[in-house]
């Protein structure tokens, strides 16, 4: 029972327009309420042109003086009428604690408001109480039961306007939108209340009777639904963004149930890096079967994962956990069940992913440490009572699908000892079959209908709202801005090293950084990637990277994927980012427009214009020009490239100059120490190093010719050739003839520092370049650079002052010029030492923090805006 107060505790607002006859039923049902508190009724005539409406209102005022109040206003629409009533109630009765909205063609049962008011008083944390919908006329009984879900409310209007709303909701500023003339203004009102921090509560047997006709205002609203929902989503934009949707999913209907065999508990979460609710097995079984019996009312995870804490920790260590869950989710939706096996045989500093789709090839050298099962398949297995194992049901899937993912980690890393996940899954299934909860799994006592999405699939709302495939379970941590770097492959080239270093600097500035590898399913060097990024992700789309000979822009080919790829799937992987940097990933151009529509800041990082076999300019600079409209910024690695982009049509305000820096930072004092050590070395053979890929671009033929000339001249030179061989893995025959040992690419900072500490000269004879990072990091420690004048090399090297530039020419001419220069340096170490010291001095403050600082400040401002 409620305490007696002086004055009405509850107000009923009845807006009316052209329902002069039905109005009588509505007001009578409000007057007949059986309550232990006082009720006042406010009729708002919204400028109805029918005289009968006005007379009916007057009749009720005279028939129930003090209880029925009448306001007549100019026509403004349903929202305006309700707001007029709200203002009148708030200004007239301080005693009113709640307001109920009753449409003039509906009615309520005698005990409705007593029950609703008591529910409101029992739950001080809620803002309103809402009913089921029981229709008459066209009969239908709608089930809106279960715990209130904001996530579901974003997809469907689950709260009828005929709800009881606490006064404080209006005091906080919630009102009906008077510009909404097409309907669903109540949906908009509830979302406003949600934004103000209020939540609803469903009340069974509320007592609302809703009149339904074949044609009505509600029917018109359904026809205009797309226009209305678009307006609502724009107005309440923060609610419909990824961060909000994902956080709501995690709280209300987490998609993953992770059973860790070492703890015996199930964690319910939508992000493997975020702790969710923890349940013991019996409690989990109860919730599982309860949701199986009443899927509209209760939630259960859509995917059950069996693993151990040690494996999840291992995945987090390599920044792979969120991506692995996303990738397994994309596979298990087709397969029903997928295994993950982890090995440590990828080679040094390397990670590699292999997906096995052949049902006959589902065995791994390592037992699976994780199994993910779709709940739908679990149900089929539990209902069948099959003794053949869950894989026998998965084999019935009609499409050829993946069964096993193998993750190979660096071979110098220890793996945790893991129990086979298959055995744990079998135990879990046996326990579920034996569980007493199964006694009520098939029984549903609900006679009402529900056309909404079942609660266990609310996680799909995020996909639909964002128009993507499965979304990566990546939560925003501590409010950090999130940026993704998109690469075709993640190796140790200049494009990749630029991305790694920009990410490192942004991470130090408080960003959360993420690496996305589109074309390759491997990456290196692991340590640098782990240091620079908070997550590592592979698109794993076999159609990426296939070039279309018929699709060109200014002579450069585009990949097939830009016009026919699985863009929604990729956008799901990228969901939740504030900014993306496309680092020469041609396929990713297709994603920039939809990302910008989601207010993601888009940046293209350009490094170099390639040359074709016929020395025709082509490549990423031209491809990016074709998509220039979709980018907010285009970052150029040199002034030369900046000027070219501007000259070819890109507005100067969109361009940013980000000069390349060294590929890795050095501890304070290290560069100076290396320079001192080199100067103090005893005279000996000139130490000349070639560091980079052994291919046409890097001038392999020029290098070979130079070595041959220096050997013929018997110059005192010690050579080191360091880099990857050609694609097929064989040693170039020219170098074989010279008997030059090729050292593998140096992937760690210590290895690179040793190389630079050893060398006097680094020789770079490229056919084309941007601004090579090797030049900057060599000069930083006093290594004298001898390089061809291509690209923007001259922006870092001043000829005869901080290095030496060789004019671009044919192979023979360049080799001859390089050999003459090396002979000069062999003979005059004073020149070598002078240039060495000048180079080190010139690079003293040339760091990524300084070269990228202005651009990153602009990027941060753009993201804030």
Q: Which sequence ranges carry the predicted segments?
A:
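Short, acidic, metal-binding catalytic loop of nucleotide-sugar glycosyltransferases
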Residues: 28-38
């Amino acid at each position: 029972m409620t305490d007696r107060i002086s004055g009405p505790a509850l107000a009923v607002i009845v807006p009316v327009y052209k329902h002069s006859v039905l109005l009588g039923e509505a007001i009578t049902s409000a007057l007949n309420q059986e309550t232990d508190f006082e009720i006042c009724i406010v009729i708002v005539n919204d400028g109805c042109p029918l005289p009968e409406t006005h007379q009916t209102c007057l009749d009720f005022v005279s028939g129930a003086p003090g209880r029925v109040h009448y306001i007549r206003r100019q026509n403004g629409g349903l929202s305006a009428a309700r707001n007029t009533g709200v203002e009148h109630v708030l200004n007239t009765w301080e005693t009113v604690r709640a307001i109920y909205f009753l449409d003039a063609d509906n009615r309520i049962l005698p005990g409705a408001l007593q029950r609703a008011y008591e529910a409101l008083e029992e739950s001080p944390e809620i803002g309103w109480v809402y009913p089921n919908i029981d229709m008459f006329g066209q009969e239908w009984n709608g089930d809106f039961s279960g715990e209130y879900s904001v996530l579901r409310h974003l997809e469907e209007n689950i709260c009828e306007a005929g709800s009881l709303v606490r006064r404080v909701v209006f005091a906080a500023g919630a009102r009906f939108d008077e510009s909404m003339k097409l309907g669903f203004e109540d949906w908009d009102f509830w979302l406003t209340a949600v934004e103000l921090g209020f939540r609803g509560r469903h009340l069974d047997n509320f007592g609302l009777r809703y009149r339904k006709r074949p044609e009505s205002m509600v029917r018109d609203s359904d026809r205009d639904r797309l226009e209305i929902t678009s307006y609502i989503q724009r107005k309440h934009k923060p609610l419909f963004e990824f961060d909000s949707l994902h956080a709501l999913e995690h709280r209300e209907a987490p998609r993953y149930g992770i059973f860790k065999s070492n703890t015996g508990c199930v964690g319910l979460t939508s992000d493997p890096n975020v702790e969710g609710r923890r349940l013991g097995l019996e409690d989990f079984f109860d919730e599982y079967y309860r949701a199986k019996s009443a899927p509209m009312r209760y939630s259960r995870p859509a995917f059950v994962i069996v693993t151990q804490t040690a494996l999840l920790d291992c995945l987090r260590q390599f920044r792979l956990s969120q991506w692995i869950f996303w990738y397994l989710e994309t596979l298990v939706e087709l397969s029903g069940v997928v295994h993950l096996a982890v090995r440590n045989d990828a080679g040094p500093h390397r990670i590699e992913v292999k997906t096995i789709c052949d049902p006959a090839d589902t065995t791994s050298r390592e037992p699976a440490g994780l199994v993910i099962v779709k709940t739908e398949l679990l149900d089929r297995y539990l209902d069948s009572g099959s003794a053949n194992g869950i894989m026998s049901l998965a084999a019935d899937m009609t499409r050829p699908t993946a069964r096993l993912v193998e993750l190979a980690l660096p071979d110098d890393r220890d793996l945790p000892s893991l129990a086979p996940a298959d055995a744990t899954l079998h135990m879990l299934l046996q326990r579920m079959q034996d569980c007493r909860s199964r006694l009520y799994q098939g029984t549903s006592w609900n006679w009402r209908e529900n056309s909404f999405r079942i609660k266990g699939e609310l996680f799909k709302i995020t996909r639909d709202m964002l128009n993507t495939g499965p979304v990566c379970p990546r939560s925003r941590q501590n409010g950090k801005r999130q940026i993704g770097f998109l690469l075709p492959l993640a190796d140790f080239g200049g494009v990749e090293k630029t991305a790694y270093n920009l990410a490192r600097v942004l991470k130090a500035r408080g960003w959360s950084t993420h690496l996305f590898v589109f074309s390759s399913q491997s990456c290196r060097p692991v340590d640098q990637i782990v240091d620079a990024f908070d997550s590592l992700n592979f698109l794993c789309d076999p159609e990426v990277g296939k070039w279309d000979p018929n699709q060109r822009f200014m002579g450069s080919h585009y990949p097939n994927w830009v016009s026919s790829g699985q863009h929604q799937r990729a956008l799901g992987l990228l969901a939740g980012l504030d900014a993306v940097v496309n680092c020469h990933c041609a396929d990713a151009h297709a994603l920039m427009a939809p990302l910008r529509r989601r207010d993601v800041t888009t940046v293209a990082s350009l490094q170099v214009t390639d040359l074709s076999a016929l020395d025709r300019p082509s490549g990423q600079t031209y491809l990016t020009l074709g998509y220039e409209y979709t980018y907010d910024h285009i970052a150029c690695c040199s002034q030369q490239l900046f000027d070219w982009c501007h000259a070819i049509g890109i507005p100067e305000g969109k361009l940013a100059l980000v000069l390349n820096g060294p590929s890795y930072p050095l501890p304070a004092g290290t560069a100076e120490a290396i320079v001192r050590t080199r100067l103090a070395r005893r005279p000996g053979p000139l130490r000349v190093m070639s560091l980079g890929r052994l291919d046409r671009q890097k001038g392999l033929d020029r290098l070979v010719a130079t070595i041959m000339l220096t050997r013929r001249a018997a110059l005192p030179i010690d050579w080191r050739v360091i880099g990857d061989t050609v694609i097929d893995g064989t040693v170039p025959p020219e170098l074989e003839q010279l008997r030059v040992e090729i050292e593998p690419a140096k992937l760690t900072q210590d290895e690179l520092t040793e190389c630079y500490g050893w060398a006097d000269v680094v020789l770079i004879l490229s056919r084309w370049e941007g601004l090579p990072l090797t030049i900057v990091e060599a000069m930083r420690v006093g290594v004298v650079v001898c390089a061809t004048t291509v690209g923007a090399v001259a922006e870092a090297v001043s000829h005869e002052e901080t290095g030496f530039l060789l004019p671009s020419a044919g192979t023979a001419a360049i080799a001859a010029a390089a050999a003459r220069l090396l002979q000069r340096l062999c003979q005059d170490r004073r020149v070598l030492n002078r240039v060495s010291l000048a180079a080190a001095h010139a690079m003293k403050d040339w760091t990524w923090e300084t070269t990228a600082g202005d651009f990153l400040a602009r990027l941060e401002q753009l993201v804030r805006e």
